């Protein structure tokens, strides 16, 4: 009817009315021939009625539909049904939804982790999105948290799956006193935005506005964050914007089925990454659509969940400059401009938010980013492992500090081998066999780590001398590269060991 849609405004019109919007203009200016919405509100029946058939707004490049007479307290599942005449029909969820239903994995989530989950609809096909008009407003006990040591925080990197026996955000909440008493200033959660499946490191994201149900409900995440704030600890999210999986709606909407990757006309993704580090589908960060999406997502996480900062994964890949292994770390002015833009967006939403990049580029580029107030990961694993094993060669700690203390130094991370394991395998003399000696060596490492000015990060259980390999299986009985991202042994019993507890 010629109505123009503002895709930036809230889609909740009133207590019973919602407008859904789907942008589908490709890089050549083309769009799908038709679009419908299937959902609980129309019994998943494909019709040309006003509660199913979407209207076209060419000026905005999108399809839209307004749904009336809805129940404000009910969760509605829905999908878009789009296609071209004589071509492929696609059913996909909404990229901006805050909850999804996954028929292949939801049944594996324990009720204790996600109670009363909405049942998957009979009319659905694949992942479906969910909305509810009336938001579940959360009563924050600490509405305006401020970090105690923003310049030199001690950050604890945590993977929820491998931190407690129930693998959940609620389980982690029960351990906050342990972390607080240890002196932790901030907890950095490995990716918790919806990823493919339930068992993952989380670097395979598909829905960025929904937090993964495998760890808990939105309220449980907020309970955890609020409890951290009450205890004086910040919460940092590890976010992945270098890429997304093929389940991400922006990827599915413009997909090359023959080549099993994003199509050439996709306005969000590259068909092939210009850099050598990509996995899954590579975002084109020079696209205004991608920039807008990422900024909107960052602001949402800051506002809705009161996150205190972000660790950006693989920022070296935020570029359209073609490179190889030999040149990817070279100074890239275009990449710097993109990253500064995202940093500015975070600061505009929350002026005291921490921004950390996993960058690993040449010194000039990292120094320019550091001058903006951005922190950068500084990998000291090799040197500290050498020291832990009792070997002098390559054990220098000089790379931990620069005149500008913007490097987040770490001895271990989720992505590096554990010092305790290396001690048992390649330690010098008695270090291989004697636990008290190993622990004393790790304590010496800590003394030459935490006394250096600047932000510091420790990997979970490193404080107890965790000595299972990064490539260990769940039982700790086998070590192989195939187990790298698999579940790991959870050893809270270490804390009952007087020698380990001393560390």
Regions found by a protein language model. Name each.
Residues 422-446:
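Aromatic-anchored helix/helix-loop segment that forms the rim or "lid"
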Residues 86-142:
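Extended, polar beta-sheet/loop recognition surfaces of beta-rich domains
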Residues 20-73, 83-105:
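Aromatic-rich carbohydrate-binding modules that target alpha-glucans
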Residues 97-101, 110, 115, 136-150, ...:
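Substrate-binding/active-site clefts of carbohydrate-active enzymes
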Residues 193-194, 199-204, 229-231, 314-416, ...:
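Active-site-proximal helices and loops of the catalytic beta/alpha 8
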Residues 1-31, 121:
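Non-catalytic, glycine-rich low-complexity segments
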Residues 28-30, 71-72, 147-152, 180-181, ...:
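Extracellular/periplasmic catalytic domains that process cell-envelope and extracellular macromolecules
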Residues 74-78:
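Exposed beta-strand face motif in extracellular beta-rich ectodomains
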């Amino acid at each position: 009817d010629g109505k123009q849609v503002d895709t930036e405004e809230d889609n909740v019109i009133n207590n019973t009315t919602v407008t859904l919007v789907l942008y589908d203009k490709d890089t050549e200016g083309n769009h799908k021939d038709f679009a419908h919405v299937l959902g609980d509100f129309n019994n998943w029946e494909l019709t040309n009625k006003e509660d199913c058939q979407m209207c076209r707004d060419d000026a905005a490049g999108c399809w839209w539909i307004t749904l009336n007479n809805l129940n404000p307290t009910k969760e509605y599942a829905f999908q878009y049904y789009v296609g071209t005449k004589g071509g492929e029909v696609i059913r996909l969820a909404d990229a901006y939804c805050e909850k999804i239903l996954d028929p292949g994995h939801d049944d594996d989530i324990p009720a204790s982790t996600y109670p009363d989950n909405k049942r998957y609809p009979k009319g659905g096909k694949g992942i479906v999105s969910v909305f509810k008009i009336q938001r579940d407003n959360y009563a924050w006990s600490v509405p305006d948290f401020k970090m105690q040591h923003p310049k030199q925080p001690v950050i604890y990197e945590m993977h929820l799956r491998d931190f407690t026996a129930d693998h959940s955000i609620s389980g982690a909440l029960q351990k906050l006193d342990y972390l607080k008493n240890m002196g932790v200033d901030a907890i950095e959660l490995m990716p918790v935005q919806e990823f493919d499946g339930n068992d993952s490191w989380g670097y395979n994201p598909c829905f960025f506005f929904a937090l993964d149900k495998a760890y808990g409900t939105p309220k449980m995440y907020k309970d955890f964050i609020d409890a951290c704030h009450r205890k004086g600890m910040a919460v940092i999210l590890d976010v992945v914007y270098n890429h997304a999986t093929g389940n991400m709606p922006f990827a599915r909407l413009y997909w090359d089925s023959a080549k099993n990757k994003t199509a050439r006309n996709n306005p969000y993704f590259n068909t092939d990454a210009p850099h050598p580090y990509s996995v899954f589908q590579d975002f084109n960060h020079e696209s205004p659509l991608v920039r807008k999406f990422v900024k909107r997502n960052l602001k949402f996480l800051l506002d809705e969940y009161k996150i205190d900062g972000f660790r950006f994964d693989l920022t070296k890949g935020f570029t359209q400059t073609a490179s190889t292994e030999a040149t990817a770390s070279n100074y890239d002015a275009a990449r710097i401009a993109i990253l500064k833009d995202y940093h500015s967006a975070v600061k505009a939403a929350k002026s005291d938010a921490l921004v950390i990049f996993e960058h690993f580029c040449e010194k000039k580029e990292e120094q320019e980013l550091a001058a903006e107030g951005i922190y950068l990961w500084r990998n000291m694993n090799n040197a500290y492992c050498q020291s832990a094993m009792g070997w002098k060669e390559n054990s220098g700690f000089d790379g931990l500090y620069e005149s500008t203390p913007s490097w987040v130094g770490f001895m271990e991370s989720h992505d590096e081998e554990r010092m305790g394991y290396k001690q048992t395998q390649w330690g010098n003399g008695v270090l291989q066999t004697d636990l008290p000696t190993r622990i004393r060596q790790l304590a010496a490492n800590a003394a030459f780590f935490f006394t250096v000015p600047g932000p510091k990060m420790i990997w979970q259980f490193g404080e107890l001398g965790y000595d299972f390999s990064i490539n260990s299986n769940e039982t700790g009985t086998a070590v192989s590269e195939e187990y790298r991202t698999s579940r790991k042994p959870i050893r809270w019993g270490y804390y009952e060991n007087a020698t380990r507890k001393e560390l």
